[in-house]
Regions:
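Conserved SAM-binding loop of SAM-dependent methyltransferases across substrates and taxa
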Residues: 75-88
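Class I SAM-dependent transferase core
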Residues: 1-64, 69, 99-102, 106-116
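Hydrophobic packing within well-folded, soluble alpha/beta domains
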Residues: 68-69, 82, 91
Length: 145
């Protein structure tokens, strides 16, 4: 339930709360079409995907205009929840699978997120430098570095 997000992040603005609340229905729509998130795991959407993505924010606050790349974003995790949480931080979400980026672009458009760009590309072909690299279940640290 979205209330779990609100419990762990009580200082969210009303706009952020609305966006986090909307996430479930947007992903439910897409999950019925192309299985963005494991169907068995979807019932745990807010805890296993949204809160898990946001957990870094309990330890690290990103300053305005920081540039972050989310590698292997899949359905947009952790990038989309973090972009909602940090609206003045610039996120680039990449994935080699174009259908995943298609879904991510629809989520971004539906939530009117202006601080995210997307690319269908593998990390080794990215030329731009970023302040931080984030990912979930993509590769071991040695491979990413």
């Amino acid at each position: 339930m979205v209330q779990e997000v609100f419990k762990y992040f009580p200082n969210l603005t009303e706009i952020q709360r609305e966006k986090f609340t909307s996430l479930y229905d947007i992903y439910a729509f897409w999950n019925n079409k192309i299985n963005v998130i494991s169907r068995n795991d979807f019932k745990n959407f807010y805890v296993r995907h949204v809160l898990h993505s946001m957990s870094i924010a309990k330890f690290k606050h990103f300053s305005n205009d920081t540039n972050i790349i989310d590698v292997g974003t899949g359905g947009g995790f952790p990038g989309i929840p973090l972009a909602i949480l940090f609206p003045h931080v610039n996120f680039t979400l990449i994935d080699s699978k174009k259908k995943k980026i298609f879904v991510v672009n629809d989520v971004i458009k539906s939530l009117n997120l202006k601080n995210i760009t997307t690319k269908s590309i593998r990390l080794e072909f990215v030329k731009k430098k970023y302040d931080y690299l984030i990912c979930r279940s993509v590769a071991d640290t040695k491979t990413l570095l």
